[in-house]
Curated annotation (Swiss-Prot):
Function: The phosphoenolpyruvate-dependent sugar phosphotransferase system (sugar PTS), a major carbohydrate active transport system, catalyzes the phosphorylation of incoming sugar substrates concomitantly with their translocation across the cell membrane. The enzyme II FrvAB PTS system is involved in fructose transport.
Domain note: The PTS EIIA type-2 domain is phosphorylated by phospho-HPr on a histidyl residue. Then, it transfers the phosphoryl group to the PTS EIIB type-2 domain.
Name assigned to this protein: PTS system fructose-like EIIA component
PTS EIIA type-2 domain ranges (all copies): 2-145
InterPro entries, per database record: PTrfase/Anion_transptr, PTS_EIIA_type-2_dom, PTS_IIA_fruc, PTS_SugarTrans_NitroReg
Keyword terms of this UniProt record: Cytoplasm, Kinase, Phosphoprotein, Phosphotransferase system, Sugar transport, Transferase, Transport
Biological processes, Gene Ontology terms: fructose import across plasma membrane; phosphoenolpyruvate-dependent sugar phosphotransferase system
PROSITE patterns given in the database record: PTS_EIIA_TYPE_2, PTS_EIIA_TYPE_2_HIS
Localization of this protein: Cytoplasm
Superkingdom classification of source: Bacteria
Organism: Escherichia coli (strain K12)
Signal sequence range: none
Gene designation per UniProt: frvA
GO cellular component terms listed in the entry, alphabetical order: cytoplasm; transmembrane transporter complex
Residues at the catalytic site: H64
Length: 148
């Protein structure tokens, strides 16, 4: 997986619901050249949310999906000041999203990346850094996490 760059991070994502946030994440993935079709990837993310919320807890969601439109594994990060209902496991609204996309054949990559993120998301300091950090801080935090 390629390292995240500043163009993979949106600290002021717009939208008041799952559809609008996921649509913007799919657009960011397309703009970064990670996918070939933003609509197809959006449908993948929406289907995953319909099966079970990706709201991990503590204000963080990890929307993810495998799709033929994904060219290489990638991670994006988005945040907004106002949290929105994401039907998270702890009932808290979400204001941070770590979005993961992998090619259709990327089951192993997906499991590895989600496992790495989940081991970090349980720590309050990690969440605090995601919620408060500037672009450079979030970039360094996620790149360090994903390379370990």
């Amino acid at each position: 997986m390629a390292a995240l760059t500043a163009s993979c991070i949106d600290l002021n994502i717009q939208g008041n619901g799952a559809y609008s946030v996921l649509k913007q994440l799919a657009t960011i993935a397309l703009q970064n050249g990670f996918i070939t079709d933003s609509h197809q990837f959006l449908q993948t993310l929406l289907l995953r949310e319909k099966m079970h919320s990706t709201g991990f807890g503590s204000g963080v969601a990890v929307p993810h999906g495998k799709s033929a439109c994904v060219k290489q594994p990638f991670v994006l990060f988005a945040r907004k000041a106002q949290a929105i209902d994401w039907k998270a496991s702890d009932g808290e609204d979400v204001n941070c999203w770590i979005c993961l996309g992998v090619p259709q054949s990327g089951e192993e990559d997906q499991v590895k990346i989600i496992g790495t993120l989940c081991r970090k998301i349980i720590h309050k300091e990690f969440i605090h850094q995601l919620q408060q950090g500037d672009t450079d801080q979030v970039l360094a935090l996620l790149n360090q996490t994903l390379s370990s």
